[in-house]
Amino acid sequence: MAVDIQYSYSSMAPSLRRERFTFKISPKLSKPLRPCIQLGSKDEASGMVAPAVQEKKVKKRVSFADNQGLALTMVKVFSEFDDPLDIPFNITELLDNIVSLTTAESESFVLDFPQPSADYLDFRNRLQTNHVCLENCVLKDKAIAGTVKVQNLAFEKVVKIRMTFDTWKSFTDFPCQYVKDTYAGSDRDTFSFDISLPEKIQSYERMEFAVCYECNGQAYWDSNKGKNYRITRAELRSSPGKIEPYNGPDFGISFDQFGSPRCSFGLFPEWPSYLGYEKLGPYY
């Protein structure tokens, strides 16, 4: 945009007063300067930030091979190897190990009788009646070990285990060793035994033993109520069946529906009754 500026000089000479000087200023073609103070948008002025433009997510698409002209399945055919595979595992060794393991399990032995001391009342009655009774017995590494309780009838005494490995075609007596009692003055003595079992035992033969106690020229036996203490193979162990009824004397005891005795005098005759309590001395 052109700007005309006129100047008049009245104080100049008369010859120059009539002359006018005209200056014409044309604008520059350069871009105008930006102001140094910039006003933000209404959102920035109010403290709010304009949300960023969300990118458009590309939807996933599933395409199958048959849509692209390919096969859905891939078949691979393997041919036999020319050289045999070197398999480190031999199937024959596996079968031999299985057979040996089965044989070892079948040749393992177990006790075919309960621990005598598990039923303390029966154990005490047998000890008082027979003066000798097997207390405990265990099997360990082709050996049998246990303890025997005897009544202290005399100082000199001999305790031995009479055992057979061929159904009493022959037998062997193994002496027991005296075990010092912790409590002095007891009327019972303890003996221990440790017997090694043979390497080869025929499957049709029975292993049995009984306990013999010799004192004052007499022999007392504990033969497990006439059945002997049997050691049998694990596969031939007798299954627990019905408990044999007790054929001993009847003390007038009646049992309830749960098998508990209604009268304790027959099972525990040494327990003092209420009527005779004042006439009895101390129990020890």
From Swiss-Prot:
Motif PP1-binding motif, chain ranges: 61-64
PROSITE patterns according to UniProt: CBM21
UniProt KW keywords: Carbohydrate metabolism, Glycogen metabolism, Phosphoprotein
Pfam families: CBM_21
Protein's UniProt keywords contain Phosphoprotein: yes
Gene Ontology terms: biological process: glycogen metabolic process; negative regulation of glycogen catabolic process; positive regulation of glycogen biosynthetic process
Signal peptide (residue range): none
Protein known as: Protein phosphatase 1 regulatory subunit 3B
Naturally occurring in which organism (per UniProt): Mus musculus (Mouse)
Gene: Ppp1r3b
